[in-house]
Amino acid sequence: MKKFTCVQDIGDLKSALAEAFEIQKDRFKYVELGRNKTLMMIFFNSSLRTRLSTQKAALNLGMNVMVLDINQGAWKLETERGVIMDGDKPEHLLEAIPVMGCYCDIIGVRSFARFEDRDFDYQETILNQFIQYSGRPVFSMEAATRHPLQSFADLITIEEYKKTARPKVVMTWAPHPRPLPQAVPNSFAEWMNATDYDFVITHPEGYELAPQFVGNAKVEYDQMKAFEGADFIYAKNWAAYTGDNYGQILSKDREWTVSDRQMAVTNNAFFMHCLPVRRNMIVTDDVIESPQSIVIPEAANREISATVVLKRLIEGLE
């Protein structure tokens, strides 16, 4: 594997899942694989689970790890071509990227959507600059449009907990006080569409995701109807995608907060969320603290998904 930015990069999902469950049983099975290999993790945005789980995955494989927080201990970086650099950014990303590539074997990049220009975001400008100019395999630790490490962990979790071969999985929008990127819901939809699950997306009108991510999923604007008979509920906020509303909050309707009321019509569904979660905005205390909440095992599987991805990237170096 030469890069990891979307579900297509992982190849056959059954094979990837088999590898994930193998690593779950013995996390240090491939500890010699990464000997004398260096991972560089580059963060343009904050992180808890991604930072810790990816570092742990690299250690599982015997790698050296370097972490760089852009704009915190490093020069501020200009990201756009054609800019007259007479401001507070003394270095351009197009010089910084190949320099970073000199010091490592694999690069992970975390760079969120800015919500200033949809084309800039959805062209994955920053991530693709790393792919083009670093000379190293690059993987996404959440980019403007996708969060594949999270989605792979979500898939592992569903496969662990499902009680039927073809579960009903519902991704629901929920309110949040701040506008959040579409990366997690886009990516989750992309990965669910790559399975044979019964996959439903529910959200208020105006929160439609980009068609290439919705794919063949059923879109239901009635949340209660969408929840009926569900085996898994995946809650997530996202800002508007369409038109002039891109990046905006259109609603904070707490009727969409996942509570016992909605969960009562499910098939005793498991509750999932990528974390961090705003309690009593996204989900009530009772639901996230219930026995059906699997947000912690879901987070634990971030280490597993990252280990599989790094293992395959290392193997691709040979």
Swiss-Prot record:
Glycoprotein as UniProt keyword: no
Chain positions recorded as N(2)-succinyl-L-ornithine binding sites: 142, 176, 236, 278
Organism lineage: Bacteria, Pseudomonadati, Bacteroidota, Bacteroidia, Bacteroidales
Protein family membership: Belongs to the aspartate/ornithine carbamoyltransferase superfamily. SOTCase family.
Signal peptide: none
Reaction it catalyzes: N(2)-succinyl-L-ornithine + carbamoyl phosphate = N(2)-succinyl-L-citrulline + phosphate + H(+)
Annotated keywords: Amino-acid biosynthesis, Arginine biosynthesis, Transferase
Residue numbers marked as site, Key residue in conferring substrate specificity for N-succinyl-L-ornithine versus N-acetyl-L-ornithine: 90
BP GO terms, sorted: arginine biosynthetic process via ornithine; citrulline biosynthetic process; L-arginine biosynthetic process
Organism: Bacteroides thetaiotaomicron (strain ATCC 29148 / DSM 2079 / JCM 5827 / CCUG 10774 / NCTC 10582 / VPI-5482 / E50)
UniProt-listed InterPro entries: ArgF'-like, Asp/Orn_carbamoyltranf_P-bd, Asp/Orn_carbamoylTrfase, Asp/Orn_carbamoylTrfase_sf, Asp_carbamoyltransf_Asp/Orn-bd
The protein's Enzyme Commission number: 2.1.3.11
This protein's name: N-succinylornithine carbamoyltransferase
